[in-house]
Amino acid sequence: MAGTRSAARTTPAPDLRACLGAVDNDRRLQVMEWLKAPTRHFPPQVEGDLQRDGVCGALIAEKLGVSQPTVSEHMRLLVSSGLVTAKKIKQWTFYKRNEPVIRAFTRRMREEL
């Protein structure tokens, strides 16, 4: 338990405006929810493990019913806020929630509000 606390404290405080802007969209909020339980919301992938590597942007685009460029812009905002991480495998980008930053963001929201 102490290790968890220590790790949470070493996570830099996220930029509130960037995080709030990133989640100020129904589609991005939906993606954040899906990424909580990727094996429940996405089929197995040829490349990359859903849990370890994240979800391929092409699968997110398909599930949202949007084009690849549209999902790339949504994911760019989530990644730049720090709420999501991106990992390249071959020509694909895989996305995963950044739980330490999400915890720091929610903690900071409680403190600020």
Task: Name each model feature, range by range.
Residues M1-W34, S80-S81:
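N-terminal leader segment of winged-helix/HTH proteins
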Residues A18-G21, R27-S67, I89, T93-P100:
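N-terminal helix-turn-helix DNA-binding core of bacterial DNA-binding proteins
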Residues E62, E73, V79-S80:
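Alpha-helical residues within the helix-turn-helix
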Residues S72-H74, Q91:
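Base-recognition residues in the alpha-helical recognition helix of bacterial helix-turn-helix
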Residues G82-V84, K90-Q91, R107:
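Short, Lys/Arg-enriched C-terminal cap helix and immediately downstream tail that follows
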Residues K96, P100-L113:
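Short, Lys/Arg-rich amphipathic alpha-helical interaction segments
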